[in-house]
Amino acid sequence: MKEIFLQISNRQDLSQDQVQVVFDRILKNEVSESQIASFLMGLKIKGETSDEITGIVRALKSHATVLPETFTDAMCNCGTGGDQSYSFNISTTACFVLAAGGIRMAKAGNRSISSKSGSADVLEVLGINVAASPEILSKALDEVGLAFIFAQTMHPAMRFIGPARQALGIPTIMNLVGPLANPLDLETQLMGLYRVELQEIVANAIQQLGRKRAVIITGPDNMDEAALYGTNTYTLLEDGHISQHTFTYEDLGMEKVELSDITGGDAKENAEILLSVLRNEASPYLETTVLNIGLGFFANGKAGTIKEGVELARQLIADGSALEKLRKLQEVQV
């Protein structure tokens, strides 16, 4: 590790191979907690690169639990977290509607770190087994078109990194890596990101990982979701090209919703919010979720524009298709 630390201290970027070797050792529990913390902090101070992100993702995937069935058409819509917005579980709610629209959703997630309720916490309240076996996850992806991929189950070696991350208490490269380390080889992706200036770096990493199409979204105030106030910035990966764009709620003909109107609560409260959205109960939560679903359909290519995606989202919620996806997942992922 000494040579690696020297290189980072000289603000020299690491290659994919170098990072992959380091993380392979970390995931085998061959590196001390203090060294892991120093490594993560060093990369943060130096500035993370797409090669470094890709190297860590590949190391994690090589140690991940493998599903018995291969799926090559899946999508994930989880974000980095770390935005301190304390909003409700938007991407978790959205995944049921995206699945109802015909997208196979391999929704990655974890327990709460900075918010009151992580996706795993909410889904447990709803009776979904977040620690389901690989066999059950494959069945859910096949029969429901949706499964919740719990980070702790699919990446058991991540436990060696957790203490160092908790000790640091700040976002690191691991926040960027988490949404990209889905054990499935995703075809498309919608990724929320807490810093606009990292979008191009992450887009390059996503391209290196073989995604056909992706959208990386940062909302106003560096939210890792799109919001109905201020300006949203997204980077689009399409046909090998990377481009950055902005939009506002006014561009989509939607009403303004302040951040204070979509604050979440504990797992039980957020589960009730999720159900209210899928029941099509009018609220700021519904409008914000519909926006992010529309972005998901656009990221996948199911919709030609975000506005078209929003319209599709409204239809799938109104006709009960999205709520039915939840019911089916409750029956299968047990």
UniProtKB/Swiss-Prot annotation:
Q: Which cofactor does it need?
A: Mg(2+)
Q: Record's superkingdom?
A: Bacteria
Gene3D superfamilies the UniProt entry points to: Nucleoside phosphorylase/phosphoribosyltransferase catalytic domain, Transferase, Pyrimidine Nucleoside Phosphorylase, Chain C
Which major enzyme category is it?
transferase
- Keyword Glycosyltransferase in annotation: yes
Q: Which SUPFAM superfamilies match?
A: Nucleoside phosphorylase/phosphoribosyltransferase catalytic domain, Nucleoside phosphorylase/phosphoribosyltransferase N-terminal domain
State the Gene Ontology terms under molecular function. anthranilate phosphoribosyltransferase activity; magnesium ion binding
Q: What is its EC number?
A: 2.4.2.18
Q: Quick one: which residues bind anthranilate 1?
A: G79, N110
Keyword annotations from UniProtKB, A to Z: Amino-acid biosynthesis, Aromatic amino acid biosynthesis, Glycosyltransferase, Magnesium, Metal-binding, Transferase, Tryptophan biosynthesis
Residues annotated as binding Mg(2+) 1 are: S91, E225
Q: Which family does it belong to?
A: Belongs to the anthranilate phosphoribosyltransferase family.
> What interactions and quaternary structure are annotated?
Homodimer.
Q: Mind telling me what this protein is named? A: Anthranilate phosphoribosyltransferase
Instruction: Write the lineage as a comma-separated list.
Output: Bacteria, Bacillati, Bacillota, Bacilli, Lactobacillales
